Amino acid sequence: MSSFRFTQVNVFSADPLGGNPLAVVHAADALSETQMAAFARWTNLSETTFLLSPSDPGADYAVRIFTPGGELPFAGHPTLGSCHAWLAAGGQPRQPGRIVQQCGVGLVSVRSDGPHLAFMAPPLLRTGGLEPEVLSRITQTLGVQPSAIVHHEWVDNGPGWCAVMLSSASQVLSLKPDWSALGPLKLGVIGPHDPGHDAAFEVRAFISGGYEDPVTGSLNAGLAQWLIGRGLAPRSYVASQGTALQRVGRVHLCQADGQVWVGGEVVEVIRGEVTL
């Protein structure tokens, strides 16, 4: 057995008990995929990441991202949390203020912007309106009439997200999903807040197995690409997520030079070693 540096960080909130936690194992090149998957099941967090030496010369570090159910090619809050952990451990990017992460979807750029880290949203792998059978499953899951869905789209950037927009944030917050109807879908739901709220939209993320993700970077990335691209959201806005779970997070979205950036605060909560 070997010991590895370990940190647990909180992403998308300055509150250590808000946002979405992430477990990070550093310098994990010696671990097998089986060991990584087993440790991710043990932590039972939405994601656990393993920092590795990059194989791509353009990357500062590599990361593998695991949920308790398996590996993901990309996820948003693990990208920001892993980057924060790498920097806090003394990582030095090749280019000041810009960090390049290697993961399952290739290279992802991360920038340091004051108290925030922000990643460049990866290209969408699937777009377009949702199929009738998918919409039928969603309305059954959410317990709403088809007319309650004002817009819908595939926003898949790796995890497989589909998304619907409701007419208000209050509708989003009132949802009590029928988990048995969701099936294999990974569903994002978004609705606008009233003027004067510190966030423009409320977001919720529903995943099969009865799980609601507290704050989801990949989903918010896909939502921003869709909504900004269609003129349904301003080029810069803040999304709130986790409210229904009392884990309020804030995700900062902006479009610059044709690219969508997804940012938020990250704080370290636990530091130590793990023996595996």
Regions found by a protein language model. Give the residues of each.
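Active-site proximal loop and beta-alpha junction motif in alpha/beta enzyme cores
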Residues: 1-74, 80-276
